[in-house]
Amino acid sequence: MEKFEGYSEKQKSRQQYFVYPLLFQEYIYAFAHDYGLNGSEPVEIFGCNNKKFSSLLVKRLIIRMYQQNFWINSVNHPNQDRLLDHSNYFYSEFYSQILSEGFAIVVEIPFSLGELSCPEEKEIPKFQNLQSIHSIFPFLEDKFLHLHYLSHLEIPYPIHLEILVQLLEYRIQDVPSLHLLRFFLNYYSNWNSLIISMKSIFLLKKENKRLFRFLYNSYVSEYEFFLLFLRKQSSCLRLTSSGTFLERIIFSRKMEHFGVMYPGFFRKTIWFFMDPLMHYVRYQGKAILASKGTLLLKKKWKSYLVNFSQYFFSFWTQPQRIRLNQLTNSCFDFLGYLSSVPINTLLVRNQMLENSFLIDTRMKKFDTTVPATPLIGSLSKAQFCTGSGHPISKPVWTDLSDWDILDRFGRICRNLFHYHSGSSKKRTLYRLKYILRLSCARTLARKHKSTVRTFMQRLGSVFLEEFFTEEEQVFSLMFTKTTHFSFHGSHSERIWYLDIIRINDLVNPLTLN
């Protein structure tokens, strides 16, 4: 553990410590409008209910809070706090929004400066394709075929908000800014409880999106920081003595005895002596840790993660949050796809002169499918169908024009197909397309007090073209006219689009209203 602390201090000493006296001065307004950071566009803060707050309001509120009379009145009259006065909800919400989002702008400034620290003459390579979350799946398809075990990690959440403040102390030296952060977090949670409630986290995430995103990303970066430390220490074990593990000592002695009896039999290093390469992939609060090692080694990694999180973050990680499975016998849910690596058996007939025989070939394949139940549940929550998948009309949209209704339904359908284009089986997608198409027709029929058949006959091909997805256009160009191909088949061609930067809202039911 002392070695980890030394490694942590060494890595963090390379970073420039951030000083934040600007938070309580008017220079925040000029600094946030620096041309190197944001160009000529002013900084706009998006709050709840799509409200916009300029950084000028942030500056004025900070100056007002910095005045002595404001805080004296708050101390002498705690029930009449101007910021947290629940009797005047508008000002309470307005001030907390401005100040919290203003704090998020300030703490993001050093990270923006770090991106501009490189010389202008040095060309910085841009990997725009790697910004897509779909770029993860080609990586998994290339690597997971050679791995054996898979660990599902759920980053512990929610946690005590004081831990978030303590993690920022590594980078923030300004004490008043940390007190201000505690002031906000105390407003949204019960400070005396060890674990905050999901209601407090939901309020903090909904009303202060920018601040919550920064705090959560800071916490995740620290979580991955000590995970990287464990990975580096694991890779260094091959250069040191293997006497730290009892089973390695026994195995080494057996191999030495075997080498005396059969000299020259083993000319190469056996993979058991080398810690396998670990692959780590994360999105939001879920992560995957895969390796080629043994089950015993994976259990050790699980123990390391639990113990380190208990020591470093001062909370207990439930062991069931880390699930260990064999890769070929399980499937994992990640980014809205149900992925697995099944073993397919292939019989090949080999003809040699007059003799022929069958060869049983076993091949691994990275398979990605779309789970039907969660998506139908999301459509049901959005009031497009019932819980069993029966399409219904959407009365909320009946006040819109016909073309707006068609455009909304068609856009949802195209977005679903676009996001799930990497599915090896399209049957679930066409079922969702049928639900959206019939729901659209029933919405239009309800608006005009008519029947569904009447509207289908009136619109004709125009109604179908709105639900004609981009992926189907690509497949129509790939296959010739002589090829018997049906869009409603179960073809396994997959397309990974590299322009998707976030998960689809229907994939994550928590984002739906």
Curated annotation (Swiss-Prot):
For the keyword RNA-binding, the answer is yes
Subcellular localization(s) per the UniProt record: Plastid, Chloroplast
For this record, the Gene Ontology CC terms, alphabetical, are:
chloroplast
**BP GO annotations:** mRNA processing; RNA splicing; tRNA processing
Q: Which UniProt keywords apply?
A: Chloroplast, mRNA processing, Plastid, RNA-binding, tRNA processing
Q: Which GO terms describe its molecular function?
A: RNA binding
InterPro entries reported for this sequence: Domain_X (IPR024937), Maturase_MatK (IPR002866), Maturase_MatK_N (IPR024942)
TM region positions: none
The protein's predominant localisation is plastid
Role: Usually encoded in the trnK tRNA gene intron. Probably assists in splicing its own and other chloroplast group II introns.
* The family this protein is said to belong to: Belongs to the intron maturase 2 family. MatK subfamily.
What HAMAP family does the record point to? MatK
* Protein name (database record): Maturase K
Q: Which species is the source of this protein?
A: Molinia caerulea
Instruction: Provide the gene name from the record.
Output: matK
